Amino acid sequence: MSRDVYVCSKPLQYFNVRNIDYESTAREKVLVIIGFFRDAHSFFEKVKQLDDSWTEVLYFDSMFQFDRYLFTHPAETLFAEIDVSFIYGIFHKLSRFKRMYVFEEGFGAYRNRMDDSKGLKRKINQWTGAGDHVGYAKFLTGQYLYKPDLYRQLYPDYAKELRSFRRPFMERLREELPMFLNFSTGHEEFLTLRGKSIGIYITNHEINEKILATLEAERERFDLIYVKLHPHIQETIALKDHPVKIIQSNIMVEFLFILLLDNGNKLTIFHESSTSIIWFQNLVENRNLGKPFEEYDGVAAYIQSETL
């Protein structure tokens, strides 16, 4: 039976695949959730119960399990976050999918990203057509982006399809908020905060002690200070002696921003070139304490200029 398969491993990816407008002749529309985030199985159960957009909703603990599924259940069109994968290249050669689109997850979609694999893996990538440049795999049909015009400006010779999402990011965020509150856990306390001065630190893969020191020095400015941990962080002992609360939620932080701003809270966001802040630059105090990052700054400036 013909099917289109949408695979996502984070709530933001699920948010984005719901915003894809794709006309298809496939009889099935299958959503695959990979359990790489907090309370992922609970999220999957809620999606399965409440989101009737899909013919089938599946859950896998690992990409290996998904690869086994795709091998035995070929797709007409595959939607994924990244194309630099020799597994996808092999599967395309074996006709496990006919077309493939990657979709934006954040500002990284606009970066000149290279896969620096060496040796045998690099040779396999080249043989399978995955290549070494994100968005340029030989088997890739195209990309879904929020700012395709920016992408064309950055990469004028790009030859594959560039498609827009159904709705602009901020508009879609408003539309999806009620449903995501039903899907998510641990956000309840944010519904009651009103008129507060709140600091939020969005971590990268590691907790930055210098940012914690900044929060410590500025603690009198805030009624509350929160830390939103990167999903890969398991150890939180570095936060033990600091005046912060860990956000114990799997909800997209962008939805928390909306909730808090709508209730009249003043937000100061500390981060290191985070995608999450890029759409809110004119609505919060933006404290980017990361190292200079020209590609990020260019994308952020483009989006900020469009929202002024």
Where are these regions (language model features)?
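Conserved catalytic-core segment of nucleotide-activated headgroup transferases in glycan assembly
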Residues: 185, 194-233
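Short hydrophobic beta-strand segments
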Residues: 1-9, 31-34, 76-81, 152-153, ...
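Active-site and donor-binding regions of nucleotide-sugar-utilizing enzymes
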Residues: 5-132, 276-278
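Flexible, charged surface loops at secondary-structure boundaries
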Residues: 1-2, 22-27, 51-52, 67-76, ...
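Donor nucleotide-activated moiety binding/catalytic core segment of transferases
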Residues: 61-68, 232-281
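Catalytic binding pocket for nucleotide-activated donors in carbohydrate/polymer assembly enzymes
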Residues: 276-308
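Catalytic phosphate/metal-binding cores of nucleic-acid and nucleotide-processing enzymes, i.e., regions
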Residues: 20-23, 250-252, 259-260, 290-293
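A nucleotide-sugar donor-handling region in carbohydrate enzymes
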Residues: 116, 120-197
